[in-house]
Amino acid sequence: MGLSRYLSRRHHWVIQYCALLLFLYFIYSYVAVSNDAPRLNEEIPVFREFSEDLPQGSRKFPEQKPAAALGDEALDPFEKYRGHEKIKWEDEVAYEKDKAREGPGEWGKPVKLPDDKETEKEALSLYKANGYNAYISDMISLNRSIKDIRHKECKKMTYSAKLPTVSVIFPFHEEHNSTLLRSVYSVINRSPPELLKEIILVDDFSEKPALRQPLEDFLKKNKIDHIVKILRTKKREGLIRGRQLGAQEATGEILIFLDAHSECNYNWLPPLLDPIADDYRTVVCPFVDVIDCETYEIRPQDEGARGSFDWAFNYKRLPLTKKDRENPTKPFDSPVMAGGYFAISAKWFWELGGYDEGLDIWGGEQYELSFKVWQCHGKMVDAPCSRVAHIYRCKYAPFKNAGMGDFVSRNYKRVAEVWMDEYKETLYKHRPGIGNADAGDLKLMKGIREKLQCKSFDWFMKEIAFDQDKYYPAIEPKASAEGEIRHVASNLCIDTQFKEQNQRFGLRKCASEDKDGGGEQDLRLTRWHDIRPKGRKICFDVSTSVDKAPIILFDCHSMKGNQLFKYRMPQKQIYHPVSGQCLTADENGKGFLHMKKCDSSSKLQQWAWQTIDQELLDQRQANEHKELE
C-alpha cells in the first residue's frame, strides 16, 4: 500500500515539489562549472559551433557576404534592441546624492598623506607592494564621488531605451583590496541595474590574504555577492588568459573588460552599448582618464586620439580627423585599442576566436584583437561620452618576473604571422628579436582568418590607419637639425644621459671636446618638430606654462602639443609655442633645464645646433605655420 494514500492532496503536492527541487539541485551540482576549473574555448557553445569546421591547410570557402560564415538569423542578434525611442540615461538622483558627499578624495580631489614618519613608513611599504599609493586608497571611501569630466554636451545625449545586458570582467593579480573594491563599486553605482548582469573578478593566483576569504566575506556582508562573482585560477595565467577565463564564464550579451584599478564616470555604460546594439560587430572603447598614482586625484588625460603603433610595436596615438574634432560627443573610428578597456558582444568575441590562447601573460593582445576586428569586417570606435579613469603605476614594479623568457616577442611574432602579411618584415627589421622568436602553432588563428575571409593588412594600413606613415614611418625622415645643442652662455651641451620618461636633464661638457665623457648628446629636431635623442623615441616635453616650467623626457607621440618646438635661427632660441616660452639654462650651466619667458637679448636662452639643414628647417616650419592657421 503506497504512502500516498495516507497523505492529503496538499501534502502529496508538497512532497512532489520538494523532490523536484532536490532533482534540480542534483543536476545543477553535477553540471556547474567550478571556479577552480575554468573552461577551454572549445567548451564555449558559440565558439564550438563556429569553430568546428575551421579550414585545414588551404581549404577554400565559397564567396560570402562580409559577415562571412557567421550563421543564419543569429547574424543579427541585437535586432530586438533597434527601433526603440532614444532616451537620456543620466542618473540625476545619484548625481545629486554625490554632491552632498564630503571626505578624503571626494569628487576625485587629491589626498595627501598625514605628516608623520610612521605613516610615511607604512605608506612606502604599501607603495612598493602595489606600484601606487595604497595607503591613500585606504583613506578614501569605496563609494567616493567623482568629478564629471565629460564634454558638457554628453549630458544631453540620448541612447536606445532598450540595451543589451553586460558582464564586466576585472582580471587582477595581487591588487590592493580597497582599490579593487572601489573599481567594483564604481561600476555598481554608475550602471543602470537592468543592464548590469554581473561583475566577474578573475583572481590570477593572488597570494595576499585579504584577497581570499576576507574578500568573499566582504561581498556577502555588503550583499553584493549576487552580482559580483570571483573566479580563481590554480596557477599564474597572466592578464590575457585572465580576461579570457572571465569571458568564458560570462553570461551577459556584451563583455566589458576593465583593469582592476579603475573608476567609472557618470553614465559610462549606455555610450558603450548603443553602437554595439546597432551592429554587434562593433567594438567600443571608453576614453581613459587618469587616477594619480600618488594622490588618487582624477583628471582627464585628453580629449581623444586614435590608437596606433610604431614599427617597434610601441602603442602610439594619431590625431583626430577634422570631422571627429567637429563632433566631440560622437564615437570615432580608431585603428588600435589601448588594450585594457573595451566593450564587445560575446557573440563577436567568440566568433573572432576570443583572445589567441597562444599569447602569454601580456603584450600584443591589443594589436591582435584590433587587427582582426577591422580585417574581419568589424569596426572599432572610441566613445567620448564614456569615461573610465585608470591608475598608471609609478616608481615601483611590484610583481615577480613571470619566468617565461621573452614572452612579449613571442606574442608579437604570433600577431605578425597571422595578421600582418608582408608588413611583418618591416616590424622584424625594426625589432629583430620578434622575427627570431618562435611563434608556436598558428593553425587555429589562421583558420579563423580564413573562415571569416578577412581582409589584408595592406587594406588595414591604407583604409583604417591611413595616416600612420605620416606620424610613424617605417623609414625615419631626415632631421631638420641634429648633433650637439650647445648653450652659448656656458659653452656646455644638453645631455639627456639616457634618462627615462618623466625625468629632467641638464648640461654637461660637450662630447666633441670630451671623448671619454659618455652621455647622450646626439639630438634630433625631427619632421614632427619634436626633439629626441638619436635612436630613441623619447622626447622633450613641457606640460605647463608657469615660470621656470620643467622640461622632461616623455614618450614621443608625434602629435606636437607639449612636444612641439621651433628653432628661431636669428635669436638662436628653442621656442615652445604651447607655453609661449623659451628653453633656458642657468649661466653656470648647473641644475636642470627649464622654460622662461622669451628674451631675445638673453644668452641664457641661446642655443647652437651642431648641424642644421636650413632649407629643410625653413620648409617644415613654414608648413607648420600653415597648419596652425
Curated annotation (Swiss-Prot):
Topology in the lipid bilayer: Single-pass type II membrane protein
Catalytic activity: L-seryl-[protein] + UDP-N-acetyl-alpha-D-galactosamine = a 3-O-[N-acetyl-alpha-D-galactosaminyl]-L-seryl-[protein] + UDP + H(+); L-threonyl-[protein] + UDP-N-acetyl-alpha-D-galactosamine = a 3-O-[N-acetyl-alpha-D-galactosaminyl]-L-threonyl-[protein] + UDP + H(+)
Residues in compartment: Lumenal: 34-629
Keywords, ordered alphabetically: Disulfide bond, Glycoprotein, Glycosyltransferase, Golgi apparatus, Lectin, Manganese, Membrane, Metal-binding, Signal-anchor, Transferase, Transmembrane, Transmembrane helix
Ranges annotated as spanning the membrane: 13-33
Domain of life: Eukaryota
Main location: Golgi
Cofactor(s) demanded: Mn(2+)
Region (Flexible loop): 393-406
Catalytic subdomain B as annotated region, ranges: 331-393
Pathway(s) where this gene product acts: Protein modification; protein glycosylation
Function: May catalyze the initial reaction in O-linked oligosaccharide biosynthesis, the transfer of an N-acetyl-D-galactosamine residue to a serine or threonine residue on the protein receptor.
Protein family: Belongs to the glycosyltransferase 2 family. GalNAc-T subfamily.
Record protein name field: Putative polypeptide N-acetylgalactosaminyltransferase 10
Gene (name only): gly-10
